[in-house]
Amino acid sequence: MVNLFPVFTLIVIITILITTRELSTTMLIVSLVTDYIIINTQYTEQQHENNTFSMPQKNSFNESYNKDKKSNTHIPYQWLAPELKEAESKYWWGNYDPHSEPVLAGAS
């Protein structure tokens, strides 16, 4: 079920802001709303901290998987260098000049 208190409060505040023209009343309402928002967010953060577990759950599968997983960060790419040089001279990621492309007939 949806909590209608914040919606009702917002409607009341907007009505008061529209009907009053005094700056002091508006500032009072704005300060009350900001205090309400700050208190509400601090309460929800504290409630969230109380709901979390203090001890992390252990998962033996994850631990063994991370232990057995080999590092694949040091793969030698020297064998790919000649192919990259050839592709660099042949394709667009090398020396691409859009003005050297042939113009299609009828292109606007």
Curated annotation (Swiss-Prot):
The protein's name in its UniProt record: Inner membrane protein H108R
Biased composition annotated in UniProt, kind: Polar residues: 49-64
Organism of this sequence: African swine fever virus (strain Badajoz 1971 Vero-adapted) (Ba71V)
Hydrolase found in the keyword field: no
Subcellular location: Virion membrane
Transmembrane segments: 10-32
Gene induction: Expressed in the late phase of the viral replicative cycle.
Keywords linked to the UniProt accession: Glycoprotein, Late protein, Membrane, Transmembrane, Transmembrane helix, Virion
Keyword tRNA processing belongs to the record: no
Superkingdom, natural source: Viruses
Family membership: Belongs to the asfivirus H108R family.
Biological classification of the source: Viruses, Varidnaviria, Bamfordvirae, Nucleocytoviricota, Pokkesviricetes
Record membrane topology: Single-pass membrane protein
Sites where a glycan is attached: 50, 62
GO cellular component: membrane; virion membrane
Region entry Disordered, spans: 49-69
